[in-house]
Amino acid sequence: MHATSHEPAVWHGTTILTVRKGGRVVIGGDGQVSIGQTVIKSNARKVRKLGKGDVIGGFAGATADAFTLFERLESKLEQYPGQLTRAAVELAKDWRTDRYLRRLEAMMIVADKEVSLVLTGTGDVLEPEAGVMAIGSGGNYALAAARALIDTDKDAESIVRRSLDIAADICVYTNRNITIEALAAE
């Protein structure tokens, strides 16, 4: 008799990277969505503008969960206009304490002209060191590449693109269908 697995299929994927350099902040992400060993979609858009366009964000994890969190963050940004850190902390509090939100499986990187933040389901709100942060299955590869490139003459967008290409070379859950959003930074 063969053993069968009744475990739910595991969604894999994505690499999201942010780089803050030279008066710009850039968030980029790949477009691959996989379930198990199968690519379901190659051109998903996991990076977008939020609020009134003064915040950009990217997500890794379950798509429906991420959109729920983006909506919640936009609501917090309406409550605390121009205060991304405060809005993110308030979202993180809700995420940790709300029974429904606690079940959501996603991570987010968000940025405005002043700050870049990573938000996790455990209530962490982290600001990256040296203006570089990555999440997702290829995040460590993209992060290493971006840190290696940050002190070169490349601009923020070039660093994000090259680093995501490197991650796609290594991580089977990351592809080269890259979406970029950028803002002027202080």
Swiss-Prot record:
First-level EC class: hydrolase
Annotated localization: Cytoplasm
UniProt-recorded Gene Ontology molecular function terms: metal ion binding; threonine-type endopeptidase activity
GO CC list: HslUV protease complex; proteasome core complex
Residues the record lists as binding Na(+): A168, C171, T174
EC code(s) of this entry: 3.4.25.2
GO biological process, one term: proteolysis involved in protein catabolic process
SUPFAM superfamilies reported in the protein's UniProt record: N-terminal nucleophile aminohydrolases (Ntn hydrolases) (SSF56235)
Key words, A-Z: Allosteric enzyme, Cytoplasm, Hydrolase, Metal-binding, Protease, Sodium, Threonine protease
Top-rank taxon: Bacteria
Active site: T14
Regulation of activity: Allosterically activated by HslU binding.
Reactions this protein catalyses: ATP-dependent cleavage of peptide bonds with broad specificity
Subunit structure: A double ring-shaped homohexamer of HslV is capped on each side by a ring-shaped HslU homohexamer. The assembly of the HslU/HslV complex is dependent on binding of ATP.
Family affiliation: Belongs to the peptidase T1B family. HslV subfamily.
PANTHER family hit by this protein: ATP-DEPENDENT PROTEASE SUBUNIT HSLV (PTHR32194:SF7), METALLOPROTEASE TLDD (PTHR32194)
Entry function: Protease subunit of a proteasome-like degradation complex believed to be a general protein degrading machinery.
Name of the protein described by the UniProt record: ATP-dependent protease subunit HslV
